[in-house]
């Protein structure tokens, strides 16, 4: 089967935003205008087509990123048909993992901001993630019909809070209740969308007289931004002082793809104005799969390989989301980077070294689906029938193996114990949790060996609430949930030298392992991928006093003991262990003996090295009305918070930034609501581990050891 749409006409984009900036409504309008959903779904009444899990419709927030394919030829039918794959991403802070996961497989992004609340903490997080993956993006300032809407103030915030090179490509005509449409600064025309047919048709009109000067000014800035794309355009601009429409678009495209500038459009998705022009901009300024850097990966021989976006290359794809579907079982969403895959083909998952056969393939549209026979480079689709694939795994051609880089998932910071309400549900709960953990790598399940309880861990209280909620709805398992537990860690404060000796020589084959270790605290560094390095092992053995083959066993023994902790059973972070001496026995020494010697030495040494308990510190930002500021700050101080600063926030509010221990943040949402009559909002993300004060450490240790 030949390709229907050439790969140059593909756009794989994500729509990302802060909670409530109107992202799902924006996506809905995109689906409406591209002719897929004939009735516009409103989030206000819980009917949006992208939000397909029940809880999303109830809470009015988007949790799972659904992938949707649609086609667009332009507002004026001015383009050949383009294929746009959209990934809707959640904006709530507990789900940043979903956003990270989607950005990894996108080529471009549309960031939706609210015209009245502007750049919010979550936007900054999304922006940082998009920078990390070098995703070219444009911004849609939505809700221009809202009270307090101010387009230029949002553009200014983008420059100050996101350090973005923001260039307006439109200006709003009117604002709040009088919002009428936008001026296209490239064409220098007022776009007036018709109210009768929900904005499907429009007319180009002259710019309102009172806006001409302002439009000229911003048109000038736009042309300058385009001219800086290359020398040819610059020279023409310097000679003639103007560029043609095609040249402006060409220049803006080059600079957007290079991440030099970020174009800003505006409108109101709810009022059916502006989204149509954003679709045009996606096609004109965001990249096709062939215009982003080809993806690299590790080949079988550990060297680096490259896969270009082409059907001729060997097949490679990345699984970026797993979803459980009541009818077909597991759906594995993949982004195809290269090659072609037909229904029934075999693929290999090099991460787990397993072969898989692709049963069926479907193209998703929100929650409806159509069966397809093949996928090609650039496609985003869901595969059915894969048995052992987790988020972030690679699927590739068995004859040309490649492992595309793994996605990095943050460590969970909060845990709760769960138990089924009836004994009969125990097994069902295990199955449900297993499925949910396969879908979401930032959610973990383990059984506490001592108490036998099932412990679930995640990125925040809302995250775990939704997991428990989904067990009840999708798997019909009701649970009792225990008190939240904090993921503490341990560390050493002093350097020590210590001996570990494991000897059993009482007849028969004995055991003999003997090591001298130096343990030192080390500051946690980041490696090239931005992952934390929390442990280093250095081998300084000379003259073979400990034979080479036993050295990895010593390292392993130390690491196993580090996982078990020495104070209260929490893993130890930030240790440099140097093996510098020891001895062995020709007959009785074994890997096992040296592993035990290493772990004994670590335990003894860590207890002598002035160990400390570390607690997770959260970066908290509270946006509050000024009159509640005193209460908010006082409350954060009571929670052992360290106030880092206060600044103006949009809409006359104040932003308070603080570092607060996670253990003090439980139930914060409820307390904040009552202090500020529900007018404040907060966001929280993990920042670092820091030493816990003695009184807290003693309390935690007493509780742990009492068990």
Swiss-Prot record:
Domain tr-type G: 8-290
Subcellular location: Cytoplasm
Keyword field contains Mitochondrion: no
Keyword Nucleotide-binding belongs to the record: yes
Chief location category: cytoplasm
InterPro entries linked to this entry: EFG_II, EFG_III, EFG_III/V, EFG_IV, EFG_V, EFG_V-like, EFTu-like_2, G_TR_CS
Keywords: Cytoplasm, Elongation factor, GTP-binding, Nucleotide-binding, Protein biosynthesis
Annotated residues for binding of GTP: 17-24, 88-92, 142-145
Entry GO terms, CC: cytoplasm
Annotated GO biological process: ribosome disassembly
A GO molecular-function descriptor: translation elongation factor activity
Protein origin, superkingdom: Bacteria
Pfam families cross-referenced by the UniProt entry: EFG_C (PF00679), EFG_III (PF14492), EFG_IV (PF03764), GTP_EFTU (PF00009), GTP_EFTU_D2 (PF03144)
Role this protein plays: Catalyzes the GTP-dependent ribosomal translocation step during translation elongation. During this step, the ribosome changes from the pre-translocational (PRE) to the post-translocational (POST) state as the newly formed A-site-bound peptidyl-tRNA and P-site-bound deacylated tRNA move to the P and E sites, respectively. Catalyzes the coordinated movement of the two tRNA molecules, the mRNA and conformational changes in the ribosome.
Family: Belongs to the TRAFAC class translation factor GTPase superfamily. Classic translation factor GTPase family. EF-G/EF-2 subfamily.
NCBIfam families documented for this protein: EF-G (TIGR00484), PRK12740.1-5 (NF009381), small_GTP (TIGR00231)
Protein name: Elongation factor G
